[in-house]
UniProtKB/Swiss-Prot annotation:
SUPFAM superfamilies, alphabetized: Chaperone J-domain, TerB-like
Domain J stretches: 218-284
Keyword Membrane among UniProt keywords: yes
Pfam families referenced in this protein's UniProt entry, alphabetically: DnaJ, TerB
GO molecular function: protein-folding chaperone binding
TM spans (from-to): 7-30
SMART domains: DnaJ
HAMAP family assigned: DjlA (MF_01153)
Organism: Vibrio cholerae serotype O1 (strain ATCC 39315 / El Tor Inaba N16961)
Membrane topology qualifier: Single-pass type III membrane protein
Subunit structure: Homodimer.
Name of the featured protein: Co-chaperone protein DjlA
GO cellular component: plasma membrane
Length: 284
């Protein structure tokens, strides 16, 4: 199967960032699938493993992501109807075959078992990814965003996320930073900040101007800086994020032309958060 990457990317991309996240997730998944096809043809792509076991590694990543997601959802004792409905809706939207749906559902169900071997599964993920930081980080962020599927992270879910981060080689501080940034992004989306403006940007309308102190605080979290950060620190964080998300640079790395507008939306989100802070601090 050469579509596991797209399926996984679209599913968790939607959880992480709505339509933008789904499209970007599909793109990431496409890169995984492309590397898999090249390796099976006898080439050495150097991404997401290599050699004859490429297909097995791809499938391991897919199943592990769903099973760990099920484990996170079960951590608070009961998987909510909203979480189940969201998973079902996304599978329908992706037009999965019956076999593919069963594979994802079985993996999710396995993760809910009380004897689910989380540490062993995470070790297999590390092997499947070749220990590459970017792929392990992607896996962790999938779990963080899935924990926010029902709008909040339960303390028990947070504990499981810490186990996941530790098993993948991330520190508690690195996890907490991702949790704060994801929570801030979620609040922006719900409260009419940049996340909620994705639909507006498609219709050509202007960004809404959040006015509350809470939304300003979220803007700091989006940039990954504290409210006490100096102007220089804010600028440095902003430039770093813009460098990582600049549409032209993403295109140069293989982003399809059709996704240029999507990349622009992401950079606009970063710019919007920066503008709020710049005006507040009087940064020139």
């Amino acid at each position: 199967m050469h579509i596991f990457g797209k399926i996984l990317g679209a599913f968790f991309g939607f959880l992480f960032g709505g339509p933008f996240g789904a499209i970007f997730g599909i793109f990431l998944g496409h890169q995984f699938d492309k590397a898999r096809r090249l390796n099976q043809a006898g080439f050495q792509s150097g991404t997401f493993g290599a050699g004859p076991s490429q297909a097995e590694r791809q499938e391991e990543f897919f199943k592990s992501a769903f099973s760990v997601m099920g484990h996170v959802a079960k951590a608070k004792g009961q998987v909510t109807k909203e979480e189940i409905q969201l998973a079902t809706i996304m599978m329908d939207r992706m037009n999965l075959t019956l076999e593919q749906k069963r594979a994802a559902q079985d993996a999710f169900r396995d993760g809910k078992e009380s004897d689910f071997p989380l540490e062993q599964v995470l070790e297999r993920v590390k092997i499947a990814t070749g220990g590459r930081f970017d792929l392990l980080q992607f896996f962790l962020e999938l779990q963080v965003s899935s924990a926010f599927a029902d709008g909040d992270v339960h303390p028990s879910e947070r504990q499981v996320l810490h186990r996941i981060a530790r098993g993948l080689g991330f520190s508690s501080e690195q996890l907490e930073r991702r949790l704060r940034m994801q929570e801030a992004a979620f609040r922006f989306q719900q409260g009419g900040g940049f996340g909620g403006s994705q639909q507006q940007s498609h219709s050509g309308q202007q960004w809404q101007q959040p006015s509350s102190r809470h939304q300003l605080a979220d803007a700091y979290e989006v940039l990954g800086v504290s409210e006490s950060a100096s102007a220089q620190e804010v600028k440095r964080a902003y430039r770093k994020l813009m460098n990582e998300h600049h549409p032209d640079k993403l295109m140069a790395k293989g982003l399809p032309p059709e996704m240029m507008n999507v990349a622009k939306e992401k950079s606009q989100q970063i710019q919007h958060a920066y503008e709020l802070i710049r005006k507040e601090k009087g940064i020139k």
